[in-house]
């Protein structure tokens, strides 16, 4: 997945979840933040950020903030991109083989899962979660309590009972992490429900990403530690 019209800037502040103040070539700009999560460990004053300039003149903001540097690590923080990256990867035949039928945004029960797949007799639901939180080389999710995330996991368990396969894929939007684990400190219940889901047959996967200022590509599997 590639971006266009990338500019580097410097993060100044975040007045609310949706916008940030940045400096580009000495000029202050208001940009749209493509992640409504807290991201407090990423968006610190002075951090180098990468922005995509929009070609839509009617927009209120000219730029989208899509990536940030944390030390020497480049982290993509576009919360809309993990689904697209995984779908692109699956359509190349990864994980389930070539020729799979893939349908995004498919309703099941009271939820809408990110992907539904059919491969031969197999019927599969998949939920995708983007991960931007990294602490001491460990990738963690979530960075804030997520009742919606718990609901999705419980619905995946129901899928298993009804004969479907179920997957939850954590897309770590960076490279060079040691492993992935649920963020018990932030949301202990999410960690508990995720472990119970794996024990019930839900496949829990984590993959890192190759990240450049203008691109992101799904990388390699990362060890998942649930206990």
Predicted regions and their residues:
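Conserved catalytic cores of phosphodiester-cleaving nucleases, focusing on short active-site segments
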Residues: 9, 113-143, 156
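Short aromatic-glycine-enriched beta-strand elements
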Residues: 16-21
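Beta-strand/loop nucleic-acid-binding surfaces
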Residues: 27-41
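Acidic-basic catalytic patches of nuclease active cores, encompassing PD-(D/E)XK
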Residues: 40, 72-102
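Flexible glycine-rich surface loops and low-complexity tracts that mediate binding to linear polymers
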Residues: 45-56, 208
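OB-fold/S1-family single-stranded nucleic acid-binding modules
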Residues: 56-73, 219
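Nucleic-acid nuclease catalytic cores
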Residues: 137-147, 157-186, 208
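Domain-level recognition of nuclease-like catalytic cores that cleave nucleotide substrates
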Residues: 173-227
């Amino acid at each position: 997945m590639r971006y266009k019209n990338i500019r580097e800037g410097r993060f100044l502040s975040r007045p609310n979840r949706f916008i940030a103040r940045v400096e580009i070539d000495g000029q202050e700009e208001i940009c749209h933040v493509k992640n409504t999560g807290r991201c407090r460990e990423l968006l610190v004053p002075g951090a180098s950020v990468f922005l995509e300039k929009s070609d839509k003149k009617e927009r209120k903001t000219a730029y989208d903030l899509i990536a940030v540097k944390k030390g020497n690590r480049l982290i993509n923080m576009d919360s809309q991109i993990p689904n697209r990256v995984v779908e692109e990867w699956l359509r190349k035949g990864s994980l389930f083989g070539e020729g799979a039928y893939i349908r995004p945004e498919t309703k099941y029960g009271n939820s809408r899962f990110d992907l539904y797949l059919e491969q031969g007799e197999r019927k599969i639901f998949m939920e995708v979660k983007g991960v931007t939180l990294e602490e001491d080389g460990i990738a963690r999710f979530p960075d804030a309590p997520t009742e919606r995330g718990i609901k999705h996991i419980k619905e995946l368990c129901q899928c298993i009972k009804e004969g479907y396969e179920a997957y939850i894929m954590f897309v770590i939007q960076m490279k060079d992490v040691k492993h992935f684990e649920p963020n018990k400190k932030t949301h202990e219940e999410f960690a508990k429900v995720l472990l119970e889901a794996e024990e019930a047959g839900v496949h829990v996967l984590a993959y890192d990403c190759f990240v450049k200022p203008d691109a992101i590509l799904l990388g390699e599997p990362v060890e998942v530690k649930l206990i």
